[in-house]
Amino acid sequence: MQIQFLGTGAGQPSKARNVSSLALKLLDEINQVWLFDCGEGTQNRILETTIRPRKVAKIFITHLHGDHIFGLPGFLSSRSFQSSEEQTDIDIYGPVGIRSFVLASLKVSGTRLPYRIHFHEFDVDTVGQVLETDKFTVFAEKLDHTIPCVGYRVIQKDLEGTLDAEALRAAGVPFGPLFGKIKNGQNVTLEDGTEIIASDYISPPRPGKVVTILGDTRKCHASVRLAVNADVLVHEATYGKGDEKIARKHGHSTNMEAAQVAKDAGVKQLLLNHISPRFLSKDISQLRKDASTIFEQVHIVKDLEEIEL
C-alpha cells in the first residue's frame, strides 16, 4: 500500500505544485488505485507516474471547490481512450453536487464514455460509512470549511495470520497440499497418526492499516475523530505559524494546528499538503521545523512523492 501525491498545492497550480489530488495505491491488496480529489492537471501528473488510468476504480471527492474537482471531467474522458477490453466502470463518492458537475461537464462537451460512472453522493451532515468491501471500509465525516467538505478514514480490515512453515516442517509436515489445508484453517492427520492443529501454526490476525485523508478544514474535533490511531494522517497546511486568524477566516489550517490534530489523535505519521504558493523552498523547511515542535513525525510532501505504508 502506497500513497502517491499528484498535487500538493493550495488554490491554484504553481511551478512546483499542482492542485489537490492523491492516489492511494492498493495494487498488492486489491489491484486497484483510489483517487482522493482530482484538481486541474491531475491527469498530467498521472502521466509522470506508473499509474494506469484503468486501475483507478474509485474517486473520493472531499468538496466541490475547483482546485479539488476541475480535473475530473478531463480524467474521466481520457480514461475512455483505452482498448475495449480494458474498459471498467468507476465509482465516484462525494458531497451532493458532484454528480451534476460531472454530468453537466460531459454533456456540454459532448463527451460519451464507454464505461459507467456510479455516483455515491451524500449529505455531509449525515454521512458515515460510504463503502465496505471484504478488505476495506471507508468512513467520511463533515469538516469545518467554507462549503460542505469531508475527510475520509480508510480502514484496512485485519490481515490473515501467517503460516509458520518452519515449524510445520519440524513437525514432519511435507511441503505441498497439506500446507494449503493448514493455512485455510483445516486440521490434518499425518500418515504416522500425528494430528496437526492448524491454529497452532498460524499467527494471530494482523491489524490492517488506517489512512486518514482530510479535505480543506479549520482545526476541528472531526479531524481528530477521523484520525484516531491512524498510521498516516494527510492534513492541509495552507498557512504557517502565527496565521491562525486568517486561516480560520478562510476555512483552513496552519501547520501548527495540523500538528496538534496529529498529536491529539495519536497518529503515527503526519503528512502535510495543500501548501500555499506563497511559500518558497526555504519556507517549507521552516514549516516542517515549526510543526515538529508539536508533533515530531511530520513531513511536508511534494508532487509525485510516494509514501510506503
From Swiss-Prot:
Annotated GO MF terms: 3'-tRNA processing endoribonuclease activity; zinc ion binding
E.C. numbers: 3.1.26.11
Cofactor(s) needed for function: Zn(2+)
Keyword check for Hydrolase: yes
Disulfide bridge positions per record: none
Binding locations of Zn(2+) 1: H63, H65, H145, D216
NCBIfam families linked: PRK00055.1-3, RNase_Z
Subunit and partners: Homodimer.
Protein name, as recorded: Ribonuclease Z
Source organism of the structure: Streptococcus suis (strain 05ZYH33)
Gene name in the database record: rnz
